[in-house]
UniProtKB/Swiss-Prot annotation:
Protein name: Phosphatidylserine decarboxylase proenzyme
Database matches in PANTHER family: PHOSPHATIDYLSERINE DECARBOXYLASE, PHOSPHATIDYLSERINE DECARBOXYLASE PROENZYME 2
Site entry (Cleavage (non-hydrolytic)), positions: 255-256
Pathway(s) where this gene product acts: Phospholipid metabolism; phosphatidylethanolamine biosynthesis; phosphatidylethanolamine from CDP-diacylglycerol: step 2/2
Known function: Catalyzes the formation of phosphatidylethanolamine (PtdEtn) from phosphatidylserine (PtdSer).
NCBIfam families: PRK00723.1 (NF001941), PS_decarb (TIGR00163)
Catalytic activity: a 1,2-diacyl-sn-glycero-3-phospho-L-serine + H(+) = a 1,2-diacyl-sn-glycero-3-phosphoethanolamine + CO2
Originating organism: Clostridium kluyveri (strain ATCC 8527 / DSM 555 / NBRC 12016 / NCIMB 10680 / K1)
């Protein structure tokens, strides 16, 4: 059971997990763990499933998925009948007016829809994956000089489950450098997996870039793939100026995670988010929603 805090209702809710029985069997049973290490975490498994999700045969899975998880398709540009395959549906784009982006330059917004956890004054060698598991920023990006810049800074972890909108966005005006790609495995990033496998973010396929923002300093963006994520697609142009809320990229099928690192004394996270994170709960947020302010 995964419990998260709904910021709008001020209530705790139970997450409806896609493939929950499969996840529990895979990550909590001896046979499942053996199969995970032999096949499921491998690129070939996710690649084959990606081929299926890109095929016309996968289209029949779209409507039941929408119905089972009560997805509001009024938020999106394309409607159900227009998708050619499941990956078209999974990487669906929002209508311009379906998310309210706070344009105040002092306001820090969420880069996407998902479940958010935040950590301040981070120890670069003990960043929290989930209670009881930590990892090193150097091992995450394989660049010690870049990692040092975020000592005592702030870390935001936005987990996107398969039912979420899977495009991610820039949180400010600025310029983003080119993307570094790191090969890796394809473990799930669901809390069921995070509680049973150490260093998942450092083991999985991932990409990172430095975003030179106008109001919040240099920000390290890290996109982490997961089981059945066919690819991480970057849609921005390195070196080109972007606006707050512009799309940076998207994930193809699977749950996935966006991690943002801020330098020390650049942002202040809203109190409610810190409180929930300190208690071990994720908070549901939407792209463009205010999650903090500029440090002053």
């Amino acid at each position: 059971m995964i419990k998260y805090f709904n910021r709008k209702t001020k209530q705790y809710e139970i997450e409806q997990v896609a493939g929950e029985k499969y996840l529990k069997w895979t990550y909590c049973s001896p046979i499942g763990m053996k199969l995970l290490e032999l096949i499921i975490k491998k690129k070939i498994f996710s690649k084959l499933y990606g081929y299926f999700c890109n095929s016309r045969y996968s289209k029949k899975n779209i409507y039941p998925f929408i119905k089972n998880f009560n997805i509001n398709m009024d938020d999106y540009i394309e409607q159900t009948d227009n998708f050619k395959c499941f990956n078209d549906f999974f990487s669906r784009a929002l209508k311009n007016n379906s998310r309210s982006i706070d344009r105040d330059e002092k306001v820090l917004i969420s880069p996407g829809d998902g479940r958010l956890q935040v950590y301040e004054n981070i120890d670069l060698n003990k960043i929290v994956q989930i209670k009881g598991f930590t990892y090193s920023l150097y091992n995450l990006i394989n660049d010690i000089e870049i990692a040092k810049r975020f000592y005592k800074g702030t870390c935001l972890i936005l987990r996107l489950c398969p039912t979420d909108y899977h495009r991610f966005h820039f949180i400010d005006y600025g310029i983003c450098d080119f993307t570094h790609k790191i090969k890796g495995n394809y473990y799930s990033v669901n809390p069921i997996a995070l509680r049973n496998i150490s260093n998942i973010f450092c083991r999985n396929k991932r990409e990172w870039s430095i975003f030179h923002s106008k109001n919040f300093g240099d920000i390290l963006y890290v996109e982490v793939g997961a089981t059945c994520v066919g690819s991480i697609v970057q849609t921005y142009f390195p070196g080109k100026h972007v606006s707050k809320g512009d799309e940076k990229g998207y994930f193809k099928f699977g749950g996935s995670t966006i991690i943002l690192f801020f330098e020390q004394n650049k942002i202040r996270i809203h109190k409610d988010l810190l409180e929930q994170s300190n208690m071990g709960y994720e908070t549901k947020v939407l792209m463009g929603e205010s999650i903090g302010i500029k440090y002053q």
